[in-house]
């Protein structure tokens, strides 16, 4: 008899407790701390200097002024002015590594072919501001990445940190 009374109580508890233990809830509000950490990281990179010189150049695309990508060139862009710059519809060949703010590698490729306007908007802004043979680190805010819902194993509100080398452009369209 006592078991008959306990079973409904245990069932009700399991319905409320188990889902929170399984971690399957992708509600963006569950990521408020991660969002703050990512925003703080982006803000700190935006003002990072060495000897008073900004380490990242803010790039705000003319076609969308709602976000800014922070870019650090690992080569001297002034020595590469004769190289071509891709358009948003060009076919580009790049090497890249994608990490998050804690250094976890999320994706990488030694040979990736892409059309910039088929990528997240922050990647498109970065690649269309590069020239062939440029190597950059591009810090992309979540608003120009995978947004408030994330993508695959990338959580919502993730600042994307791309290491990109633009190897070539096969179709400049």
Would you name each region that the model predicts?
Residues 1-21:
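Sec-dependent bacterial lipoprotein signal peptides
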Residues 2-3, 21-173:
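Cross-family detector of peptidyl-prolyl cis-trans isomerase
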């Amino acid at each position: 008899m006592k078991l008959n009374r306990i079973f409904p109580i245990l069932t009700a508890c399991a319905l409320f407790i188990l889902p929170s233990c399984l971690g399957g809830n992708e509600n963006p509000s569950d990521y408020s701390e991660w969002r703050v950490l990512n925003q703080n990281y982006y803000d700190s990179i935006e003002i990072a200097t060495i000897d008073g010189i900004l380490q990242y150049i803010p790039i705000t695309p003319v076609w969308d002024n709602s976000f800014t990508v922070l870019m650090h060139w690992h080569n001297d862009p002034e020595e590469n002015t004769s190289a071509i710059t891709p358009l948003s519809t060009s076919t580009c060949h790049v090497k890249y590594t994608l990490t998050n703010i804690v250094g976890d590698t999320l994706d990488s490729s030694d040979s990736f072919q892409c059309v910039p306007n088929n990528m997240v908007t922050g990647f498109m802004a970065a690649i269309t501001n590069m020239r062939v043979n440029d190597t950059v680190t591009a810090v992309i805010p979540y608003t120009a990445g995978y947004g408030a819902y994330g993508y695959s194993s990338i959580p919502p509100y993730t600042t994307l940190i791309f290491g990109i080398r633009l190897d070539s452009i096969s179709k400049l369209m």
